[in-house]
Amino acid sequence: MMFLAAAVVLFGVDATDTKRPYIEPIAIVERRGARTQFSPPDADDKKAFAREYFGGKRYEMFSSGERIGTALAESPLELSCVSLAAGVKLSKPLPYSLGLATSGPLIAQHRDTVREVTRDEKAAMERLLRDQLSIELTPDVSIVAADFDHDGRPEFVANGVVKSGRTEHQFLVIATEHRGRMRTQYIYDHRKAVETDGDQARLEWFDQADIDDDGVDEIIARVHDYEGWSWRILKRTRRTWKIVYSGGGGGC
């Protein structure tokens, strides 16, 4: 059991651009009894936040719930017109280029459970996407297996953008396998006309971690819209997922 002495900042660490890795706050997390509360960082007072959390502060860093090193938050940098971020120096590379960091004890640690899907699992997910969204797999679609509740049976996440006729699907699907078939637990499917500019709301799986210490990982996701981005935290309740936090990010 983990107890939070005070509010803890949950950070996202993005090293997809190896020349410009950065760290930015996702949410302020506070645990009150059995309840975990999330609130957005105060982007209106960037200088105060930077003094408190950037400029040489070192944080534990995680990937898929496993501690893998530290992240040193350096000087603030501008990601867009409005943003709250800093350059970051990592003690070791992130396995998937994306990860989390915390300003205090927060994440219930476990080994990384993410793996590639088998040929049969991929085929089953392909059938599910065809049945549920009427789309076909493309090389741009990511499908991974991850054991969110650590019961030895993986869940499956399909994430990407696919054009089907005149419609573009920006989607994220979570499923489980039952007797050789996939069952959906969560579907996000933003549909837009292919010829329409500006209509973007792509939900990207960023990482996973047990934030509320209930034995089941939450999913941390990032929404990319036309002029910026924001964060989502998804929590599983029984056999479905729901968004329990929206906030942070930046844009113009």
Give short role names for the model-derived ranges.
Residues M1-V9:
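Sec-dependent N-terminal signal peptides
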